[in-house]
């Protein structure tokens, strides 16, 4: 009987630790990694990054130049259930026990435009609200084929990769709803 109580006690501790880890992963921070070359030279393929999710809790406004993780499936609604499901699927314990399946729906990009901004591309330059952006972080001179204008709707941001000639971003999927921002990049390790 004592052994059963000991096992139940240990299982309770393990379950409690798992629940706390899940809550932290859903609401506070998570680790992620860069897959691909779209954020070079700022971030490299396979860089591990620390992502703060506090912007979602405190509704902090994103700033121009912030690097964010987005859910690129902007045509689908996103809820807290998605955050919990992804936390269960993408945590260390699940990865050790079952391996990982890489999903390409999460992208890491830089905020270029916020609600109400007009984003244009002319003469291989990004223009926000009539002003050419100074972008020392981009990999190389970009070749923009379009002279299309984008107006960023309310509760959305316009994001782009730093490697402009090798990036799928708001130029192809449109502005990203704020509820599709998973978190804000803090540092790599």
What are these regions (language model features)?
Residues 1-189:
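Extended hydrophobic leader/signal-anchor segments used for secretion and membrane insertion
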